[in-house]
């Protein structure tokens, strides 16, 4: 299996989202479950298809000041108002490194979206820095999580609210409530969706997923971008298209009326 390169890159993913991952791969997620988060990590499956070892986390860095300047120039030129950290890895695996990268790109005044499972917890100092920069943190969670993981994610989602924009990114399923497990998970899911500033993210399982095979979650084929994909959709109107037409913008739209902070605080 190939190992990811440590050179940080600003790339547009298949849905049109500009990503600047500070880490790629996810040792924490695959150590907790060999199948990844929710027992079926889409990013891990995609990496495997491309021949990459997703179980090894690789930090991505600026190779030089010239490389850093190149990334900043490219960021300033993209038409989108935000950049996302946490597309093919979880930035929480090394918050210190992630915040150093954010410190470098904050002058672009792009909204910074972080997608995380909070494998490592932010310190109060780190939260104060993020508050000064102005970021939007998406905490990814699901009824598929264990109670321990779900409680950790919910606690962090609430903990960061006084510091920066906090979004609960709920990975949802069409649970079969005629089963005991499906009914229990559906109830948990409704509780998660009742929180404020929630994004409904459709679960994309594999055919071999145990919950699919046992009938606990219902699946269907749906058009996802330009192809057909197996999905489990609680909300049949959930958006599966290109970033450009999405109204939520990974949570940035919830706080669009707020001005971006102008910061002089440095992270070190």
Name what the model sees in each region.
Residues 32, 43-47, 66-69, 104, ...:
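A sequence-composition feature that detects small, non-aromatic residues
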Residues 2-62, 243-256:
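Canonical Radical SAM [4Fe-4S] cluster-binding loop centered on the CxxxCxxC motif
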């Amino acid at each position: 299996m190939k190992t990811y390169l440590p050179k940080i890159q600003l790339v547009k993913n298949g849905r049109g989202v500009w990503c600047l991952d500070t880490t790629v791969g996810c040792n924490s997620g695959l150590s907790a479950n060999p199948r990844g988060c929710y027992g079926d990590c889409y990013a891990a499956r995609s990496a495997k298809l491309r021949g990459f070892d997703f179980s090894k986390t690789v930090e991505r860095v600026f190779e030089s000041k010239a490389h850093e300047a190149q990334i900043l120039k490219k960021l300033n030129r993209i038409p989108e108002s935000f950049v996302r950290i946490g597309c093919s890895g979880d930035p929480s695996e090394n918050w210190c490194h992630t915040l150093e990268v954010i410190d470098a790109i904050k002058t672009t005044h792009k909204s910074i979206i972080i997608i995380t499972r909070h494998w490592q917890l932010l310190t109060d100092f780190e939260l104060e820095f993020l508050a000064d920069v102005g970021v939007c943190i998406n905490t990814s969670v699901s009824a598929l999580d264990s109670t321990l993981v779900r409680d950790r994610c919910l606690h962090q989602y609430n903990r960061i609210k006084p510091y920066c924009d906090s979004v609960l990114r709920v990975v949802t399923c069409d649970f079969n409530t005629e089963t005991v497990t499906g009914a229990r998970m559906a109830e948990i899911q409704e509780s998660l969706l009742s929180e404020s500033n929630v994004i409904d993210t459709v679960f994309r399982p594999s055919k071999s997923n145990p919950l699919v095979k046992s009938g606990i979650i219902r699946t269907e084929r749906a058009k996802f971008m330009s192809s057909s994909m197996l999905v489990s959709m609680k909300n049949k109107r959930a958006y599966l298209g290109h970033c450009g037409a999405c109204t939520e913008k990974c949570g940035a739209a919830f706080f669009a009326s707020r001005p971006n902070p102008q910061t002089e605080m440095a992270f070190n």
